[in-house]
UniProtKB/Swiss-Prot annotation:
Signal peptide (UniProt feature, chain positions): 1-19
Role description: In AWC olfactory sensory neurons, required for the detection of preferred food sources.
Regions of compositional bias (Basic and acidic residues) in chain numbering: 61-79
The species this protein was found in: Caenorhabditis elegans
Keyword Signal in record: yes
Coiled-coil stretches: none
Protein name as annotated: Neuropeptide-like protein 1
Region (Disordered): 59-79
Domain of life, source organism: Eukaryota
Name of the encoding gene: nlp-1
Length: 176
């Protein structure tokens, strides 16, 4: 029994040594040489992807989807909205949220001053400015006020769910 086991082990060792399972050291230039070559003969199929392709096409639709949407629009002409408007809104402006932070909504403006609001370029910077104490006022408050949220399931003294981001808290607190 032991003899057959030893013979089987020797046979396996001999097979492994001849099989070259461990890769030999690769030529350093082999990878570099093959890097520029295209594996596909047809260059139209081997196009490299544009790095911005996903970002740019996020809000767009493909040509097939556009054709289908146009056919559906023609079939149901009594739609309330136009699909072309959604294609124009491709990406949100990066500053849109920041710009609108300190602004008052139009409803508040109409209620405050009963005068028709004139959109002057002079008045815009005044509205864009954020209240100096707005961040400090919100410092210790709960961020999520939904009673059914996951954060509320922790204990009452848990700091999870509180706005404890102190990066801008001490800005402007220095001597004047």
């Amino acid at each position: 029994m032991k003899a057959t086991f030893v013979l089987a082990c020797l046979l396996v060792i001999a097979a492994v040594s001849h099989a070259d399972l461990l890769p030999k050291r690769m030529d350093a230039n082999a990878f570099r040489m093959s890097f520029g070559k295209r594996s596909v003969s047809n260059p139209a199929e081997a196009k490299r992807m544009d790095p911005n392709a996903f970002r740019m096409s996020f809000g767009k639709r493909s040509a097939e989807q556009n054709e289908q949407a146009n056919k559906e629009d023609k079939a149901t002409s009594d739609k309330l909205y136009d699909d072309t408007k959604f294609e124009e809104m491709k990406r949100m402006d990066a500053n849109a949220f920041r710009m609108s932070f300190g602004k008052r909504s139009d409803a508040h403006q109409a209620a405050d001053d009963q005068v028709e609001y004139v959109n002057d370029d002079f008045s815009l910077p005044e509205q864009k400015r954020m209240d100096a104490n707005a961040f400090r006022m919100s410092f210790g408050k709960r961020v999520n006020l939904d009673p059914n949220s996951f954060r509320m399931s922790f204990g009452k003294r848990s700091t999870v769910g509180y706005n404890l981001d102190a990066r801008n808290y001490f800005v402007g607190l220095g001597r004047r």
